[in-house]
Amino acid sequence: MLNSGDIGFMIIAATYVFLMTPGLAFFYGGLAQRKNVLNTMMMSVAFMGLSSVLWVLCGYSLSFSGDLGGVIGNLKWFAFNGVGAEAGPYSDNIPNMGFALFQMMFAIITPSLITGAVAGRMKFKAIFLFVFLWQFVVYYPMAHMVWGGGFLAQIGSIDFAGGNVVHISSGVSGLVLAILIGKRKGIEKRSVVPHNIPFVVLGVSLLWFGWFGFNAGSALAADGLALHAFTTTNTSAACAMLSWMIIDIIKGGKPTVVGACTGGVIGLVAITPGAGFVPIWASFIIGTLVSPICYFALSVLKPKFGYDDALDAFGCHGIGGIWGGIATGLFAQTSINPVAKWDGLVFGDYHLFVAQVLSILVTIAVAVVGTLICVGIVRLFTKLRVDENSENVGLDDSEHGECA
């Protein structure tokens, strides 16, 4: 039965999640070089338009209507045909359209996360075409497999708000794209510092604020589970922020603003798959441990393997999402949310942990193969990378004719 309180809650939650994309634009824009700040922000802002149109036309239908081989849906709800004010198949207390619009906000921010990996060197028309294709090849299949009753849901894996669908898929795709497009010119000979740290703080503040809608809203009701997810979300982010500050002090003698902000973001990433499944005490562990895990990835793995993930999309979202998925398999409890078929490994049952590991491996495979396919198609129409002169001048001027 439709519930007006739950409907209002979901409208507010969707609005919160929408705000995360401009928050990401400020976060990435602040981390970028001054000559690339507008281009970096545009690679988030533009997808507020593209992803919205695609979602209404066919994205929602391909993700959530029907089932073709456990991988993708069908076009039953093309252009929101049949998606109205009646209770939807995924929740009997909110309309189908309410669920569709909430999910649209996830489809908007996810491809924007990828762009941080290739900031400062990828043609705008190339990234625009890539994201157009990526939604069909990676995002819609992942959303269906995890949330639309597809293969990963059928094996019993769980993902409360997007550890696989949003963070691992975008982080891994960003890594593959960064490797394919190559390093920024002269990056080995110079250090790139954020051009506007107050932008970073503003961006993280908007992201953290929006994440309450992202995770609590995934309960699909204004109930105790939403409150639980809200609490685990904030706790994990806070612990990760403090944990990163401690690492900064140990390594450099001083806590850094960028480090604290990075810690907050990865704490939010790590709790996303388990926010509505793990006990509150587990969110302390998840948040505290994600900082040293991601710090190791950024300070050891990244230089060792030599890839240029410009704004650490993979190091934060890919690695953070993988840890979050594993942690969900460790700490989830059916007593908190019966959507989980089994308790986590620390409670004596291995089934969920195995399903979580398998779902992570499938997500990585889909992201890698899907990204390679999309890049292959994009290269038929345009080069991926700007020329050396454009890179030296900056993409704000060469790609958009503007200056911050």
What feature does the model see in each segment?
Residues 1-404:
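Glycine- and aromatic-enriched membrane alpha-helices
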